[in-house]
Regions:
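A structural-propensity feature for long, helix-poor, extended segments
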Residues: 237-240, 244, 622-643, 648
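Thiamine diphosphate
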Residues: 179-201, 207, 221-232, 250-452, ...
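Residue-level marker for buried hydrophobic side chains located in beta-strands
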Residues: 237-238, 266, 531, 637, ...
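Non-catalytic terminal/interface segments that mediate subunit docking, oligomerization
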Residues: 75-96, 100, 107, 121, ...
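Glycine- and acidic
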Residues: 10, 27-30, 77-85, 104-116, ...
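Cofactor-binding active-site loop characterized by glycine-rich and histidine/acidic residues
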Residues: 79-92, 96-110, 117-259, 282-283, ...
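N-terminal amphipathic, basic-rich helices that act as targeting or association modules
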Residues: 2-165, 431, 505-521, 525, ...
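Short alpha-helical segments and helix-capping/turn motifs at coil-helix boundaries
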Residues: 110-114, 126-135, 141-145, 196-200, ...
């Protein structure tokens, strides 16, 4: 039925020789019958090529007709008890509806409206039923478990099922969207909030499809590298047709086809509605998505019509019904389900006398009950069965449904259904009657949840089906069963030692050395996942190409142009590097897949994703937030960091705020190290926390491309480095000399070191220089102490780490970084009382130039640090204010220079 496009029938009215047309059609049918579809496909391709060679314009279409892909005789029959499944589905619909309506009747004085959605689950309950009952495996000794990316707005339906299974209590359902007291259910799928239930956060629409593609690829990667057997696992992704407008939803479908991810199944719930109205009122979203996915190389299965349409379509000998199906736009299809059978008879079948005659013997109720494919359990099962058996391509199921199915006049097919959270007593009664829920009228006002007795056929069936599939879903593993011991810091001694005289390196080089050393570790080396976005040569990592190879499922089918070089570009079926190309969202999605592997695969992996720091949190911040929600563990490395450290690149590349963005994610631990030993200490400690202790944190380090001598680790400062601050250079000079404390991080710490020399030589001021690898960690520590003191007023106050460090070192404080002032200014509240605190930073747009010019422009070089220190001392009455003016003149600084914020 679907092999030929419906517009073929439109051509029939212009057919000048119908007999010849019929002969061609009969010939093709004979080939299909005798030699099979492959031969027919070959002949058609030859005919099309011959037509093109003869200059016949053949417009391309990736579309098939507006009918089901599977013919009725191609459908695998559902082995389940459809009657029992329908009853269970009805109970879940009722409990999901009840949960949402109850949540919006609570505490009217407090607003009363907690939100929730009824219509979304109503539209795909049949799809979930087929999956949970027949297809979705839980993790067990024989199966690694299928991974489910569940459409966020349908969470009430998933909770309703878990309630029947006995995994959630009635008290938890009553506390839907009431989590503060610790006994409620999260609004949407959030692993952070329900760590043993939800696996993937999906309600930031578009991220689910994107992350799932890279998750499926990561399963293939693990299998290819022999780390885990993932052959029988599937990744199922549920998303709405409106969600596909998010650029992330379709942005990576080419990769899925290119890498032949036949373990990936998209199920797009085509209820034709988004939040406000139709997805494509004037068009056909199913046809549009079919062309997108088929054109990208996916296997596309369309499920549009239910079983009771089959006989009508079989009788459609002249194509009149197919033509109307194709010509009717989605806005009209939505209207049909918002009205009744008489309306459908007139406005759909009534468009052609032939189709009107086809339904002449059907009542209006019969016409109304002509279901869409997504509400037919047999059709859904058959589509799923075909999808799981398909090899060599990812599959997308385009399944047509009705938003708010079963809600009747309260929302079914209406533009307002997404916002329908409250139902009248009459609406509730109609819902009960529609789904035959055994609750008497006398109880309806209480909206009780319904759960059959455990010994009923329905409940036995419910548990039997999940037992057959290995257990209950969704379910999330919180820790891996395996254990590793992280190499001691001594293993990384070449990085923690001072560089040889005359030798200069960057912190990026220090990172690469650390990574290379870790790759050599016998136990952890194979678990390292280096992730690149086409910048390996920028970061000096091209040496890894030959050493560990770049993963490619096809291997290397060509001879690389640099084959004769030591560091040639090597792709390998078992390669260890994930090279994503110019694709930060893909890099971050691969990082998330690896960083959550302890949970999804029971395999601890250690991802290191390095990229231009400006193109991290700013570009893929929503994915970083999702990583926090998913309790990711791994390293993000922001290379070429800082507003003034990247020579010549300019406004779009120079990063002055990634640490501020990193600080918004509670479980992101961020550092801006200056020296190689700091990089080694921080990363080794991060490994201890994430790998050895399996703590749910991830690390962000900024790396520099500026070369200089490295001083080496001073024993005993390791813990202070981790906490975010240690004394790098103590003040030298007579006790009577004015004293100041210079704080810095990243490349600008070295400007503070130079300022220390100028203060002593030019102004007789002694300065302590403090390396502060993390103002974020210092701020969190201070806030924690302040909070504890607030809530324990009668106890001995706790002292912030900043105050502890500075307490014994008198003098004002000047903090300078290559980031916006608000980064270092976070610790202002924790500076010891009575101290002046000055902050220098890089507020404003970046621009291209040399480092020295940029640091002068942003007023963060050694001269400005000296002036800030003198100004702070003058405010405390230690030096005359005239000295400040003299310093400005001495260093030739312009007092009337434009503020770099506005430059």
């Amino acid at each position: 039925m679907s092999a030929l496009p419906d517009n073929l029938h439109t051509f029939a009215s212009n057919d000048s020789d119908s007999q010849e047309t019929r002969e061609w059609m009969d010939a093709l049918s004979a080939v299909i019958a005798s030699e099979g579809p492959e031969r027919a496909h070959f002949l058609l391709e030859q005919l099309l090529e011959h037509a093109r060679e003869n200059s016949i314009d053949m417009p391309f279409s990736a579309n098939t007709g507006y009918v089901n892909t599977l013919e009725p005789d191609q459908e695998e029959r559902c082995p389940g008890n459809i009657e029992i499944e329908e009853r269970l589905r009805a109970y879940m619909r009722w409990n999901a509806m009840s949960m949402v309506v109850k949540a919006n009747r609570h505490n009217p004085a407090d607003g009363g409206d907690l939100g929730g959605h009824i219509g979304s689950f109503a539209s795909l309950a049949h799809m979930f039923g087929a999956g949970f009952n027949h297809f979705w495996h839980a993790e067990n000794e024989n199966h690694g478990g299928d991974l489910l990316y569940i459409q966020g707005h349908v969470s009430p339906g998933v909770y309703a099922r878990a309630f029947l299974e006995g995994r959630l209590t009635e008290d938890q359902l009553l506390n839907f969207r009431q989590e503060v007291d610790g006994k409620g259910l999260s609004s949407y799928p959030h692993p952070k909030l329900m760590p043993e239930f939800w696996q993937f956060p999906t309600v930031s629409m578009g991220l689910g499809p994107l992350m799932a593609i890279y998750q499926a690829r990561f399963l293939k990667y693990l299998h290819a590298r022999g780390i885990a057997n993932t052959e029988n696992r599937k990744v199922w992704v549920f998303c709405g047709d409106g969600e596909m407008d998010e650029v992330e939803s379709l942005g990576a479908i080419g990769l899925a086809a290119r890498e032949k991810l036949d373990n990936l199944i998209f199920v797009i719930n085509c209820n034709l509605q988004r939040l406000d109205g139709p997805v494509r009122g004037n068009g056909k979203i199913i046809q549009e998505l079919e062309s997108e996915f088929r054109g990208a190389g996916w296997n596309v299965l369309k499920l549009i019509w239910g079983s009771n349409w089959d006989s009508l379509i079989a009788r459609d000998k002249d194509g009149a019904l197919r033509r109307i199906m194709m010509e009717t736009v989605d806005g009209d299809y939505q209207a049909f389900k918002a009205n009744d059978g008489a309306y459908v008879r007139k406005h759909f079948f009534g468009r052609d006398p032939r189709t009107l005659e086809m339904v002449a013997k059907l009542s209006d109720d019969d016409i109304w009950n002509l279901r869409r494919g997504g509400h037919d359990p047999q059709k859904v099962y058959a589509a799923y069965a075909a999808a799981v058996k398909h090899k060599g391509q990812p599959t997308v199921l385009l399944i047509k449904t009705v938003k708010g199915f079963g809600m009747g006049s309260s929302g079914e097919g209406k533009n307002t259904v997404h916002q329908t959270k409250k139902l009248t007593d009459e609406d509730i009664k109609a819902f009960r009657d529609r789904f035959n829920i055994p609750i008497p009228d006398s109880e309806l006002s209480k909206l009780p949840f319904y759960k059959p007795a455990e010994d009923t056929p329905e409940m036995r069936y419910l548990h039997e089906r999940r037992a057959a599939l290995g257990g209950y879903l969704p379910h999330r593993r919180t820790k891996a069963d395996e254990h590793f011991t992280v190499p001691s810091l001594d293993v990384f001694k070449p990085i923690t030692e001072a560089t040889a005289e005359g030798r200069e390196i960057s912190t990026t080089q220090a990172y690469v050395r650390f990574l290379t050393q870790l790759l050599r570790d016998q136990s952890l080396g194979k678990r390292v996942v280096p992730i690149l976005v086409d910048e390996a040569r920028t970061f000096g990592m091209e040496g890894l190409f030959r050493q560990i190879g770049i993963y490619n499922p096809d291997g290397q089918l060509y001879t690389p142009v640099d084959k004769d070089q030591v560091m040639f570009y090597k792709e390998d079926k078992a390669g260890q590097i994930l090279q994503e190309g110019i694709n930060e969202a893909g890099g971050m999605s691969s990082w998330i897949a690896a960083a959550t592997s302890y949970s999804t695969n029971n395999r601890i992996m250690i991802p290191f994703y390095v990229y231009y720091s400006k193109f991290g949190f700013q570009r893929v911040g929503d994915l970083a937030w999702a990583a926090g929600d998913m309790q990711a563990r791994g390293f993000l490395l922001g290379g070429t960091s800082g507003r003034t450290t990247l020579n010549g690149e300019g406004l779009q590349h120079e990063d002055g705020h990634s640490h501020i963005l990193a600080g918004t994610i509670p479980n992101c631990i961020s550092y801006d190290p200056t020296f190689a030993h700091e990089v080694a200490v921080i990363m080794q400690h991060g490994l201890k926390r994430m790998v050895e202790k399996q703590e749910n944190v991830f690390y962000y380090l900024t790396l520099l491309n500026e070369n200089y001598a490295m001083p080496g680790l001073t024993p005993g400062t390791e813990e202070q480095i981790i906490q975010g601050m240690y004394l790098l250079q103590a003040a030298v000079g007579e006790k009577k000399m004015p004293r100041v404390n210079l704080l810095g991080s990243g490349s600008i710490l070295r400007e503070s070191m130079a300022a220390r020399e100028l203060l002593a030589a030019d102004w007789g001021v002694a300065a302590n220089v403090w390396s502060c690898p993390s103002f974020n960690e210092l701020a969190r520590n201070g806030a924690e102490a302040e909070r504890w003191n607030l809530m324990h007023p009668t106890d001995k106050p706790r002292v912030s780490f900043v105050a502890q460090q500075l307490g014994a070192h008198e003098g004002p404080v000047v903090a300078s970084t290559d980031y916006m002032k608000s980064y270092a200014d976070q610790i202002r509240a924790y500076i010891p009382a009575g101290r002046s605190f000055k902050v220098l930073g890089t507020d404003g747009f970046g621009r291209s130039d040399f480092r020295s010019k940029l640091r002068e422009h942003f007023e963060i070089n050694r001269h400005y640090i000296v002036v800030a220190a003198l100004k702070a001392l003058s405010e405390q009455g230690v030096v005359p204010v005239a000295t400040v003016a003299k310093a400005i003149q001495h260093y030739k600084l312009s007092s009337d220079k434009i503020n770099p914020l506005n430059a």
